[in-house]
């Protein structure tokens, strides 16, 4: 649409897909598995160099939130279309993200971060933090996503088994067993704000998408404008999302997720440092 010639990379089983039909040039990646194709950083960078491409857009999924890939692209003399490696790292680690947002004045869900790596020390620190935060609460993996490494705890008697289970799942899924605690805000809505930022320090928000209908912490559908929003709340949440993006010098399209409590208060959940598959919902609303 912008008139720039494009190169698409694809695995053999994606040959002929719509995204390849829309590109000017297609490079077939060698390999059969995802690890051998869409996760092969060097092969992707080499495809860009071989075709004379000057920039790489990571799309969504796969390498789109890998800080080391952003660094590798830039080291190869190519332009990385997206946020800096620093922004990806800060927002990708949920405990660091909470601390960064707190410092930026963005409201975060009441809770505590526990940095202990040792299993026994971590569990004891989590127990003490749970007493301060209060029940019901959520245990969440610092590197988590998609509901993995997450446990709701309503009774202190269930805490130890839930914490141990969350840590095991987090290590298996992400190689990182660090867990933090958040107050469980029952009856809350899940609302995300679309932000866009350029390389000159200008950041805007494009309103919200409500994604409260979920199954196993996975979004089922998104709605825009959000049915529970009003203009005052939209602007307040939008400005908080802008502040979140500016706190890490964000560049590109991103999504800041919030919990909207029944009281009307809202709290930062996380930031997705990439374009999302839900982005077209916002495009339909904004044109």
What is the role of each PLM region?
Residues 1-256, 260-285:
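N-terminal beta-alpha lobe that positions the nucleotide/phosphoryl donor
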């Amino acid at each position: 649409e912008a008139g720039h010639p494009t190169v698409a990379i694809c695995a053999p089983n994606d040959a002929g897909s719509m995204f390849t039909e829309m590109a000017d040039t297609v490079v077939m990646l060698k390999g059969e598995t995802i690890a051998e194709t869409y996760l092969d950083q060097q092969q992707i960078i080499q495809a860009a160099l071989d075709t004379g491409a000057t920039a790489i857009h990571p799309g969504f999924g796969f390498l789109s939130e890998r800080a080391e890939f952003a660094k590798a692209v830039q080291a190869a003399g190519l332009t990385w279309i997206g946020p800096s490696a620093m922004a990806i790292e800060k927002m990708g680690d949920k405990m660091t993200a909470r601390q960064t947002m707190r410092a930026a004045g963005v409201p975060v869900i009441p809770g505590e971060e526990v940095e202990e790596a040792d299993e026994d020390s971590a569990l004891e620190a989590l127990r003490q933090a749970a007493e301060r935060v209060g029940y019901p609460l959520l245990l969440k993996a610092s590197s988590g996503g998609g509901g993995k490494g997450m446990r709701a705890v309503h009774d202190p008697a269930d805490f130890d088994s839930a914490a141990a289970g969350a840590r095991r799942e987090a290590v298996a899924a992400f190689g990182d067993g660090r867990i933090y605690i958040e107050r469980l805000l029952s009856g809350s809505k899940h609302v995300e704000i679309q932000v866009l930022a350029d390389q000159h320090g200008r950041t805007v928000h494009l309103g919200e998408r409500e994604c409260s209908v979920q199954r196993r912490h996975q979004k089922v559908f998104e709605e825009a404008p959000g049915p529970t929003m009003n203009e005052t709340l939209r602007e307040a949440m939008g400005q908080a999302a802008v502040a979140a993006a500016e706190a890490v010098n964000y560049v590109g399209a991103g999504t800041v997720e919030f919990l909207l409590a029944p009281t009307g208060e809202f709290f930062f959940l996380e930031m997705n440092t990439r374009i999302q598959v839900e982005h077209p919902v916002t495009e339909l609303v904004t044109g």
